[in-house]
Swiss-Prot record:
CDD domains: Terpene_cyclase_plant_C1. Pfam families: Terpene_synth (PF01397), Terpene_synth_C (PF03936). It comes from Cichorium intybus. PANTHER family: GERMACRENE-A SYNTHASE, OS04G0344100 PROTEIN-RELATED. Mg(2+) 1 binds at D333, D337. Expressed in roots, in head core tissue and leaves, in green and etiolated seedlings, and at a much lower level in green leaves. A motif (DDXXD motif) lies at residues 333-337. GO terms for biological process: diterpenoid biosynthetic process; farnesyl diphosphate metabolic process. This is Germacrene A synthase long form. The Asp-Asp-Xaa-Xaa-Asp/Glu (DDXXD/E) motif is important for the catalytic activity, presumably through binding to Mg(2+). Residues 1-11 have a biased composition (Polar residues). Optimum pH is 6.8. Keywords: Lyase, Magnesium, Metal-binding.
Length: 583
């Protein structure tokens, strides 16, 4: 239903009361002034679809005793799996397949030191000669294990599967569906200059699509699932659940792995449903749907997005903080894009830059509650984190929020003036308005000691991996939303700017932007290889933020219209029961 506001833009009808005007000589009073109400400004309403979840997640009630029971139940299988990982009697192939399954099931964070120690030993022993004796599936699995954990295993391990005469992959590869599927997964970990993996990606994708209709059972589901979204570009929690469902034969021989995965899924679902309840209740209490009803009401979707950055139990507080700040961003973005006039946008931007409660007087009435809540939340965070000397992280998040407000204003001025920016101009501002900087900085706030001032200083240098993830955030969004934005008459996206800058067709522009995204993924892959500049714990949210952009925007604007991918993901993680512990 269209969101139509009959009140004036500042929430109050301008009223002028006629005064009794009497002439100084006592003559008859003049006629009362005819007062015309100030017309409601034309607003760029987007009529966003309403939430598909309403208050569903508020009703959840956490059973703390059950959560504690799951925590206790984790200990036995956790120790058993640790013993498997460190078992010196297990051969290299079995050990690497075990680590592969542990990683795919989202359990590797439980054993960072043990896995690293084992991979160090194995990486030193294994060479190209060893791989001459191994099949494609095994090689591809081991390639993924090493690359996912930062080891630069050579892509030359796949050379033996190419025809020396034609230079293409052999027919034998097409007959090995599991091997081909694993090679396809491996190709997404490619670096710049790894032509063999570029070729492998195109080759395996074409052949897997060709044979998909001939496959049955789990193998058909595996191929369909991976063609839709490879593990490397997926949301870790969702990929773990899907792997458990469709790849049980990979790990079913290890009873302790199966048990650990089941208990882990049950524990995480309880914890995460409670977090979702907390942010949903907070959102309702803040009454944003009453004060700013034109915005996208997307609490579960934003929580899912942040969960995609880090799902580990010890980041619970971090997720709640980052979810709230990202919801603030949604309010700001939709206010600038889908409601405020240019004069109101200028006033709001100025107030956010001033960041003081006295600035509220200059704001239109409808946005005042938001501004007050925004300042209060940040003030509470600053007090909370000043106690352990971490207020610097809150300041960084606040500065990023102020920066994005200025970026949104820049876009609004372009639209107001009918200006289509050059592509370099667009990208400079577009990387800011992608919201990447705000989300990534806000994600640091609750991460604890690992996200210290040195880590923040590294962020501020804008390293290549950060730039790459940021670029993906901007361009993947643009490619999927530019038509919707055009229809609404909104500011030009990267697609429009590229068309204008290089005088090319829409098709060519999209193709070139997708190439830029592809190269950015290679930069991310390189940035995750050892030796890394900072802790892997800091790199992982950067990688995962790029993954979540792919999840949300690969096929459509999944955030504005969340009834497809995000609905399925939310259902899987927070509605459907996790694997039963009874069997």
């Amino acid at each position: 239903m269209a969101l139509v506001r009959n009140n004036s833009s500042n929430g109050r009808e301008p009223v002028l009361s006629p005064r009794s005007l009497t002439s100084p000589r006592g003559l008859t009073s003049p006629r009362p002034l005819s007062v015309q109400p100030t017309p409601e400004p034309v607003r760029p309403l987007a009529n966003f679809p309403p939430s598909i979840w309403a208050d569903r997640f508020i009703s959840f009630s956490l059973d703390n005793s059950q959560l504690e029971a799951y925590a206790n139940a984790l200990e036995e299988p956790k120790e058993a799996v640790k013993s498997l990982i460190t078992d010196t009697t297990i051969d290299a192939n079995t050990k690497l397949k075990l680590i592969y399954s542990v990683h795919r099931l989202g359990l590797s964070y439980l054993y960072p030191d043990e896995i690293d120690a084992e991979l160090n030993k194995l990486f030193e022993k294994i060479d190209l000669q060893y791989y001459e004796q191994v099949d494609l599936y095994t090689i591809a699995v081991q390639f993924q294990v090493f690359r996912h954990h930062g080891y630069k295993i050579s892509s030359d391990v796949f050379k033996k599967f190419k025809d020396s005469t034609t230079g293409t992959f052999t027919d034998d590869v097409t007959k090995d569906v599991k091997g081909m599927l694993s090679l396809y997964e491996s190709a997404h970990l490619r670096l710049h200059g790894e032509d063999i993996l570029d070729e492998a990606l195109a080759f395996t994708e074409a052949h897997l699509k060709k044979i998909l209709t001939t496959l049955e059972g789990d193998l058909a589901r595996q191929v369909n699932q991976v063609l839709k979204r490879p593990f490397h570009t997926g949301m870790p929690m969702v990929e773990a659940r899907l792997y458990f469902i469709t790849h049980e034969e990979d790990f079913s021989s290890h009873e302790s792995v199966v048990k650990l995965a089941k208990v882990h899924f049950n524990y995480l679902q309880l914890q995460q449903k409670e977090e979702l309840r907390l942010v949903s209740q907070w959102w309702k209490d803040m009454q944003f749907q009453q004060s700013v009803p034109y915005i996208r009401d997307r609490v579960p979707e934003i929580y899912l997005w942040i969960l995609g950055l880090y799902f580990e139990p010890y980041y619970s507080r971090a997720r709640i903080i980052a979810t709230k700040i990202t919801l603030f961003l949604v309010v700001l973005d939709d206010t600038y894009d889908a409601y405020a006039t240019i004069d109101e946008i200028r006033s709001i931007t100025d107030a956010i830059n001033r960041w003081e409660i006295s600035a509220i007087d200059q704001l239109p009435e409808y946005i005042k509650p938001f501004y007050r809540i925004l300042l209060n939340e940040y003030d509470d965070l600053e007090k909370e984190y000043s106690k352990d000397g971490r207020a610097f992280s809150v300041h960084a998040s606040k500065q990023a929020f102020q920066e994005i407000a200025r970026g949104y204003l820049e876009e609004a001025e372009w639209l107001h003036n009918g200006y289509v920016a050059t592509f370099p101009e667009y990208m400079k501002n577009g990387l800011i308005t992608s919201a990447y900087n705000v989300i990534s900085k806000s994600a640091l706030v609750g991460m604890g000691a690992i996200a210290d001032e040195e880590a923040l200083a590294w962020y501020e240098t804008h390293p290549k991996i950060l730039k790459a993830s940021e670029l993906i955030s901007r361009l993947q969004d643009d490619v999927m939303t530019f038509q919707f934005e055009r229809k609404r008459g909104q500011s030009a996206t990267g697609v429009d700017a590229y068309i204008k800058e290089y005088n090319v067709s829409e098709e060519v522009a999209i193709k070139e932007l997708m190439k830029m995204i592809e190269n950015a993924w290679k930069d991310i892959n390189e940035g995750c290889l050892k030796p890394t500049e900072v802790s892997v714990a800091l790199l992982t949210p950067i990688l995962n933020l790029a993954r979540m952009i792919d999840v949300v925007y690969k096929f459509d604007d999944g955030f504005t219209f969340p009834g497809k991918t995000l609905k399925d993901y939310i259902t899987l993680l927070f509605v459907s029961p996790p694997p039963s512990l009874e069997n």
